[in-house]
């Protein structure tokens, strides 16, 4: 079984790479501290969801529950999300009195990404706050006896993409401001010599540069705002 280890930076604050909005007027999560809609001071929001099946139904349920909703039968709901996911995801949100909040259809990306976008729009309509369902997270994963690689994935662990394939120890992956690049510490060999090295890695191109490799310990790369 592969072990996924999330560093402290993920436990306390998620920095986001917003997924590009799938509809006009959408506001992507700008990143920063993880907004917990249903924290200890708030009651869970009763929402009924109908008309969806398969993976889309599971994604909507997961997203909405993570962001502070409770999925309930229609008769007990403060809000009803109704729609479908044949070919693309669509959704109509209305409150218990029948007042419409929105009626949207999503294009672009796959059905899972469209479901995440719909979840965020539901939270935005109900609470006025941006959701986290399109957040991307950065972490390291053990891939061998003495090897950890850096990965990025959706916030729910799906769509993982390996950023490194160095087959060596890797530590402390960290987003740079703006989320266009990341820093991490690698025990890579250069010229046959293994030494801790802070790497600067550009997300768009995959290009990376040695940021710090002085003799001794190089670790914990961070960027000032």
Locate predicted features.
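Bacterial N-terminal signal peptides
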Residues: 9-18
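Interaction modules related to DNA damage response and DNA replication/repair
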Residues: 57, 61, 65-77
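Residue position within the beta-strands of beta-propeller blades
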Residues: 136-142, 181-185
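Bacterial N-terminal signal peptides that target proteins for export
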Residues: 1-10
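Conserved beta-propeller blade repeats
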Residues: 125, 168-185, 208-209, 213-225
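Amphipathic beta-strand/beta-sheet edge segments enriched in Tyr/Trp
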Residues: 61, 75-121
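A structural "domain/chain start" motif
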Residues: 23-62
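Beta-propeller blade-edge and WD-like acidic-aromatic loop motif
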Residues: 145-161, 185-210
